[in-house]
Amino acid sequence: MIKKTSRIHGWSEAKYWGFIRSCLRRAFQRYPNKYRTQASAKRVGGKYECNLCKKEFRAKDVAVDHIVPCGTLKSFEDLAVFADNMFCEIKGLQILCKACHKTKTLHERGMSDEDIKVSEFRKLPAKQQKEKLSMYINDVGKNQAERLKQYRELL
């Protein structure tokens, strides 16, 4: 099968729009409203309060989140909505700790709480998976597939 290419250097549509999306995300890093959101949320002592869990974090442990997701960017028709959502007003942005931001993003992508927990468990080294499971069951699975099944049953 011939790979569909329609852009410069033989890029596929997906690669081309991924590149455009990446450029827009990099531009957001310098967007004034991002800095204004951070500045207005800063507490005494340089800490920030997560808008979801309400705990305080250092600057390196928080992210500026779009309240309304930017959406997909897979074609020219998506570009205007994506850019409008990306470069929104300050009221469309919030400060989240990295853990809450990751969870919110995965929910927006359609993952359930259970799927997120299993995904995090899967990333643990085998030794830590076994330790975590051994607190609840006696016969811990010998391979990752068995341990994932056991973990999912515990949830």
Predicted regions and their residues:
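The −1 position to Zn-ligating cysteines in a subset of zinc-ribbon hairpins
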Residues: 49, 63, 96
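Intrinsic-disorder-associated interaction segments
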Residues: 5, 9, 13-17, 21, ...
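Short coil/turn linker and secondary-structure boundary residues
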Residues: 48, 71-77, 111, 116, ...
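Residues in well-ordered beta-strands of folded domains
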Residues: 51, 65, 154
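Short, charged surface segments at domain edges that flank catalytic/cofactor-binding sites
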Residues: 2-54, 80-89
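A detector for short metal-coordination/catalytic motifs
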Residues: 90-92, 98-155
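Histidine-centered nuclease catalytic patch
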Residues: 55-92, 108-110
